Amino acid sequence: NVIVCGIRNISPQLSLEMAQLCVAYKGRGVIAFDLAGAEYDHPAKHHLEAFQLVRDNNICVTIHAGEAYGPESIHQAIHVCGAHRIGHGCRLREDGDLLHYVNDHRITLECCPSSNVQTGAVRDLASHPMKLYYDLGLRVTVNTDNRLITDTTVSKELWLAHTQMKLGPEEIGHIVLNGFKAGFLPFHVRQHFLREVSEEIEAIQSGNLEDHGTKPKARKVAAGDKSSAAKEAPSASDSP
């Protein structure tokens, strides 16, 4: 599945054309619309027409926000552009009221630890806010942002979350499940993946791999582009 991505610092007309492609290929491999690129001096609202088009056609939205700019960028992404998920969200911690709103409405944060260190959004992995967000109950996921430039994988990011950010095995399991809960997929598909992955996580954590093989099965990352994980009980339901 593909998430069509516009860029903040290109013409809003080009973003609209990307959104039109998103609508044209809905149900034929395209599942959502994204906006990435430089936040400073390139607010998401400049691309509002593109967001209105995809939302009018019941297409999900994710927006990179709160990485290189403050919580105002996250606020605009959610309340003006209608984002269902937020890419990065590092600076959400600067606005407690908005943080509570994101938590209460189960808006997923697509955390990208290694990339955030590389871009200077955080000083190092130890100072990354993902653990704080997890402890506060936000629906966080672990992502690569990009695999090539950052030279990483979701598995590597999960390992770093465990070794450098002090998230335990059970917490990592919750975070993995959040990636499937946040997936831009039909409800019944998410339910199917959640049941399978919940059983596999339980088997791995209990050491009972007889019914699951000696190696974990390869899984699709349900969040569509980059997700894997936050503080949710490892249940097969798709509820908060």
Regions found by a protein language model. Name each.
Residues 3-9, 35-40, 64-68, 89-91, ...:
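Active-site beta-loop-alpha junctions enriched in small/polar residues
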Residues 56, 60, 78-85, 103, ...:
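His/Asp/Glu-enriched, well-ordered alpha-helical/loop segment
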Residues 1, 13-32, 39-63, 67-82, ...:
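Histidine/acidic residue-rich metal-binding segments in metalloenzymes
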Residues 91-93, 118, 123, 149-150, ...:
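Generic, ordered loop/turn and secondary-structure boundary motif
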Residues 11-14, 121, 182-184:
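Short, solvent-exposed polar/charged micro-motifs at secondary-structure junctions
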Residues 166-234, 239-240:
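Mid-to-C-terminal alpha-helical segments outside catalytic/metal-binding sites
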